[in-house]
Amino acid sequence: MKNQFAVLLVALVLLQLFSQSEAFWSTLLSIGKSLLGKRGLRNFDLEQMDDTYEPELSEADLRYLQDLLR
C-alpha cells in the first residue's frame, strides 16, 4: 500500500511538472509568433519601451548604479 501511494505521488509530481512546463513553452512560443509574424511586426510599438529608459540621471542615481555594479 505504501509503494502504491509513493508511485502515485511521484506520478502526480511528474504530471504537474510536465503540464507547467508545457504551459510555459506554449506561452513563450505564442509570444514569439506574435512578435515575428507579419502583423506582429507591423503592430509592434517601439514607443512602449520608452517608459523603461530615463535619459536624465542625477548624480545620486549614477553613484548608486556605480556602487551596484561593483
Curated annotation (Swiss-Prot):
Domain of life from the UniProt record: Eukaryota
Expression tissues: Expressed by the venom gland.
Function of the protein: Antimicrobial peptide with potent activity against bacteria S.aureus (MIC=4.7 uM) and E.coli (MIC=31.5 uM), and pathogenic yeasts C.albicans (MIC=25 uM) and C.glabrata (MIC=12.5 uM). Is not very effective against P.aeruginosa (MIC=150 and >300 uM). Also provokes moderate hemolysis on human erythrocytes (HC(50)=10.5 uM).
Protein name: Antimicrobial peptide VpCT1
Keywords: Amidation, Antibiotic, Antimicrobial, Cleavage on pair of basic residues, Cytolysis, Fungicide, Membrane, Secreted, Signal, Target cell membrane, Target membrane
Propeptide: 37-70
Presence of keyword Cell division: no
GO cellular component: extracellular region; membrane; other organism cell membrane
